[in-house]
Amino acid sequence: MLNEEKSRNSGTNDLLFDFTVDKAKKMVYITREFDAEQSLVWDAFTKAELIDQWIAPHPMIAKTKYQDFKVGGKRFYAMISTDGMERWAIQEYTSITPKTNFKMFNVFADKDENPEPHGSDWDHNFSEQNGITTVNISIYNESLERMEKILEGFTIGMKMSLSNLENLLATLSKK
């Protein structure tokens, strides 16, 4: 497919990790398997106290100012670099089907919650088979220019974040 970047990494534990970029459609597709129960993976994606433990790529940290996980609710958070620079964002939840799917609109913002002009729509799907939970994430970017601007850092950062999540889930699962 033209304008597509694809990365597949099975790692040492043979869990699927697929990251595909389709610039023509302004889409990013991520499929990642975790050796953890679906309810735990769901919690890791939907509870601020868990999200903040894995979402920021090292050495950054994440700090949620507030979260209201319901349709129409928001999470307002920052990624903080080692020099203290904060990059704020808003996630507005647009659809929630407990334990299996949630959708949100994500947009960068300033510290006062004033959003930038363009954001992205995220669709998270969760399923479990034989103790392995698969998370499928589809991300539609409103602006190709925005997508291309953040893509390199996003790709590296998301891979690091999902690796952090794998480690957190292993600790929480005691596997």
Annotate the PLM regions:
Residues 3, 25-27, 105, 109-156:
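Beta-strand/loop substructures that line and gate deep hydrophobic ligand-binding cavities in soluble
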Residues 1-13, 141-175:
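A conserved amphipathic terminal alpha-helix motif
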Residues 41-42, 51, 75, 93, ...:
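Hydrophobic pocket/interface hotspot
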Residues 14, 47-48, 72-76, 104-109:
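Short Pro/Gly-enriched beta-strand edge/turn motifs at strand-loop
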Residues 32, 64-67, 89-95, 120-127:
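Hydrophobic/aromatic beta-strand elements that line small-molecule binding cavities or substrate pockets
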Residues 29-30, 49-86:
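Short beta-edge strand/loop motif at the mouth of beta-sheet-based domains
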Residues 2-61:
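Hydrophobic ligand-binding cavity/cleft-lining segments
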Residues 38-40, 68-70, 94-101, 125-134:
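A short, structured loop/turn motif at beta-sheet edges
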